Amino acid sequence: MTLCPHHWKIGGVSLNSKLWTAKILAEQPELIKQVHKNYFKAGADIILFETVPSLKEAKVEAEIAEEYGYDYWISFSCLSENIICEGTPIAECATTFAKGYPHLKMIGVNCTKSEYITGLIHKIKENCDIPIGVYPNSGEEYDAVKKVWFGKQSALSFEQYAYNYMKSGASAVGGCCTTVAKHVEEVVRAKKRFSEEQK
């Protein structure tokens, strides 16, 4: 499926501030909506709501986009191949957005361990028909106290992971935290291999 015949201007929204707390989200969703209006008015063709940890946050963001008629993607951050960071099953998230959100052009996962992605893709596919986009971390763990990444990268090569994601049904594949140029090259090789097999 080709989503765009031309180059898109994509606006990414992943805010790390006092605005994004469970308390504000629960008590003042209108405040969050107001903040997002400026992003839509800035001229992006599509808005990417990324690293979304909560289903409620995703629903607020979707409501804003639908209200103003803007196309958008939603990408969740996940703790395992079953749940997003707040603990909601990814299957429930996919079911929530399966119908009634005509401007939602892609749903997916980012800022998540590479080894969880294939399982997450399958669970999303089982519960909705929206194209899936994934861009995981390269595999290291983040120490929030020391603010450093540590540990080894994932067992498989990023190229093999990317290929597996494509085989599983992902329409878009990329990289998030600790991915660099070589990871992009690996995704390109995976895409070439996958495309050759589709001929």
Where do the model's predicted regions map?
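Domain-level signal for soluble alpha/beta catalytic cores
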Residues: M1-K199
